[in-house]
């Protein structure tokens, strides 16, 4: 979408696109001072139009972070990660100077393995390395639009099986094994009886925009009803295809930045290029619906 058309359509905020595929900075909003309904409605529309938006120079307490997230919807509890003691809605994503692996260092959409995956994720930067630690995003509407008509038909009735604790992490360990070995960057909890393996359509329809998007990521282990050997060639192709450079944008963090993306039509990747430095991000996820 052209910037001029977008700018004309916003009265209360300024929306500055950061790439051709997706992503925009929203200017002129101080979340801590309160956001009125008209401004919030425009923020919500900018989020749907750009898939990922961010606000620089915000000075938020954890309570303000939670309150702003609740305006989007109910909080999605993280089944495998422990929240902050006084704010269980917030998961602290911390990588220390001595840790080698980071959290989110593979292309994925949050909570794909739950029956109702998080529709949105809201991250607030608390501490950053001097350089590095960017997050990359990929537009899954575009990925779907660009596959052939034949492949669209093939994918139409298929579901992907997503596992929240598989060994397809770079370490070769499950989450619980990483936590016990000190490789995890977030305190882990045992999910108990909670469901962390779910099947969802490989092509999902966005409930608010009506657009179709590919829904495949690093959590996707197989295609429902197919063997792993049968699933692997198609899934490997899709996993590579979904983050072609022309579908992506790259967000460079600054301290006090709030970034908010739509998990229903994007994937993201946390770049692990700041060894020897600390990075602390506060993460809240918004409850979604069953993908269809």
Where are these regions (language model features)?
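Non-heme Fe(II) oxygenase catalytic core, chiefly the N-lobe of the double-stranded beta-helix
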Residues: 1-258, 263-292
């Amino acid at each position: 979408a052209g910037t001029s058309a977008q700018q004309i359509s916003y009265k209360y905020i300024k929306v500055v696109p950061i790439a051709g595929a997706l992503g925009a900075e929203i200017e002129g909003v101080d979340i801590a001072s309160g956001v009125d309904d008209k401004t919030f409605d425009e923020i919500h529309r900018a989020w749907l139009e750009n898939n990922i938006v961010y606000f620089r120079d915000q000075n938020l307490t954890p309570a303000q972070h939670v309150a702003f997230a609740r305006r989007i919807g109910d909080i999605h509890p993280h089944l495998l990660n422990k929240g902050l003691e006084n704010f269980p809605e917030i998961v602290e994503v911390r990588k220390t100077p001595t840790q080698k692996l980071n959290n989110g260092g593979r292309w994925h959409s949050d909570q794909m393995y739950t029956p109702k995956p998080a529709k949105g994720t809201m991250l607030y930067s608390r501490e950053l390395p001097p350089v590095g630690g960017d997050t990359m995003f990929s537009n899954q509407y575009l990925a779907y639009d660009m596959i052939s008509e034949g492949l669209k038909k093939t994918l139409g009735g298929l579901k992907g099986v997503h596992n929240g604790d598989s060994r397809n992490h770079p370490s070769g360990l499950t989450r619980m094994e990483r936590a016990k070995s000190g490789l995890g960057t977030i305190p882990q909890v045992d999910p108990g009886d909670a469901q962390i393996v779910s099947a969802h359509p490989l092509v999902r329809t966005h409930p608010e925009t009506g657009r179709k998007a590919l829904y495949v990521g690093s959590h996707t282990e197989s295609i429902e009803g197919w063997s792993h050997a049968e699933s692997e060639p198609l899934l490997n192709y899709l996993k590579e295809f979904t983050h072609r450079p022309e579908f992506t944008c790259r967000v460079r963090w600054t301290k006090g930045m709030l970034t908010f993306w739509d998990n229903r039509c994007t994937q993201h990747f946390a770049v692990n290029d700041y060894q020897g430095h600390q990075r602390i991000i506060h993460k809240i996820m918004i409850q979604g619906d069953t993908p269809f």
